[in-house]
């Protein structure tokens, strides 16, 4: 409790307001749409579009492997009980 009172006593509203102003101005400056126009994302978008087919195939293989493991687990548990 004493440590809490000491921290409250050290609290400086001026420094907190300054930090809040700095954080607000940095947020406002970096969230402007002007920065979004400078960065060219067409290469990234085309790479994502090209990779969609591969991702679907890989996802199919993963689902198939999980189904095989689930069936093997069921068969193993049934054989253990028998």
UniProtKB/Swiss-Prot annotation:
<dbReference type="InterPro" id="IPR008020">
    <property type="entry name" value="G8P"/>
</dbReference>
<keyword id="KW-0732">Signal</keyword>
<keyword id="KW-1133">Transmembrane helix</keyword>
<keyword id="KW-1139">Helical capsid protein</keyword>
<dbReference type="Pfam" id="PF05356">
    <property type="entry name" value="Phage_Coat_B"/>
</dbReference>
<dbReference type="GO" id="GO:0016020">
    <property type="term" value="C:membrane"/>
</dbReference>
<feature type="topological domain" description="Periplasmic">
    <location>
        <begin position="29"/>
        <end position="57"/>
    </location>
</feature>
<feature type="topological domain" description="Cytoplasmic">
    <location>
        <begin position="79"/>
        <end position="82"/>
    </location>
</feature>
<keyword id="KW-0812">Transmembrane</keyword>
<comment type="similarity">
    <text>Belongs to the inovirus capsid protein family.</text>
</comment>
<comment type="function">
    <text>Self assembles to form a helical capsid wrapping up the viral genomic DNA. The capsid displays a filamentous structure with a length of 760-1950 nm and a width of 6-8 nm. The virion assembly and budding take place at the host inner membrane.</text>
</comment>
<keyword id="KW-0472">Membrane</keyword>
<comment type="subunit">
    <text>Homomultimerizes. There are several thousands of this protein in the phage capsid.</text>
</comment>
<keyword id="KW-0946">Virion</keyword>
<keyword id="KW-0167">Capsid protein</keyword>
<feature type="transmembrane region" description="Helical">
    <location>
        <begin position="58"/>
        <end position="78"/>
    </location>
</feature>
<feature type="signal peptide">
    <location>
        <begin position="1"/>
        <end position="28"/>
    </location>
</feature>
<dbReference type="GO" id="GO:0033644">
    <property type="term" value="C:host cell membrane"/>
</dbReference>
<dbReference type="GO" id="GO:0019029">
    <property type="term" value="C:helical viral capsid"/>
</dbReference>
<protein>
    <recommendedName>
        <fullName>Capsid protein G8P</fullName>
    </recommendedName>
</protein>
<keyword id="KW-1043">Host membrane</keyword>
